[in-house]
Amino acid sequence: MLREHRSLCDEFVERNISRWAEAFDLLETLIVICTESGEEFNRSYRPQAASEEDVVFDLVVRHHARACHIANEILCLLKNGFADAAQARWRALHEVAATAMFIAKHGKECAERFYYHEVVDSYTGMLEHKKYEHRLEAKGPTIEEIAECKVQFDLLIKKYGKKYADNY
């Protein structure tokens, strides 16, 4: 049963790749160029960015790496015939690219706000987990861990205002 099913799937993938070979090759070429360019850019400029604690550089490079990863997922989904799933990942790719461009355009303060919002997300997540730990049947964070995170959370709210506690 499984052998026959796998054989049918493999045959479909072979036909799909054969039918769309030129398009897949072009997409894969673009992905490789983007990945290698990003690696070289990071290798060349990372030392200076690290010495300057350039959070914009760090976030944009991370987003670029994430975008390359998502692009590879898209290629894999397309080759295997999952066009709708590939389109969903394409929307995620667009979101990552748009976020990186927004951070690059708006500079250091924007990058820091984005970067440190992880503390807000963590604190909110800790509270939710603690609240529902019995339903989840998974031990939530300790009171001490929550308190430690709350200190950082409160400092960020003081710095950026009450609205910073909201989801974006």
Feature map (PLM): residue ranges:
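Secondary-shell segments that build the walls of catalytic and ion/ligand-binding clefts
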Residues: 1-52, 120-168
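Short, glycine/acidic-rich hinge or "gate" loops at secondary-structure transitions
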Residues: 86-87, 104-114
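Short, solvent-exposed helix-helix connector turns and helix-capping sites enriched
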Residues: 20, 82, 106-107
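Short, amphipathic alpha-helical segments
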Residues: 68, 87, 110, 140-143, ...
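Long, hydrophobic/aromatic-enriched structural stretches that serve as scaffold segments
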Residues: 37-103
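Short amphipathic alpha-helical surface patches that mediate protein-protein
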Residues: 91-94, 115-119
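Acidic/His-rich structured neighborhood in mature extracellular/periplasmic domains
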Residues: 103, 117-122
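Proteins with a high burden of low-complexity, intrinsically disordered sequence enriched in S/T/G/P/A and R
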Residues: 80-81, 111-113, 166-168
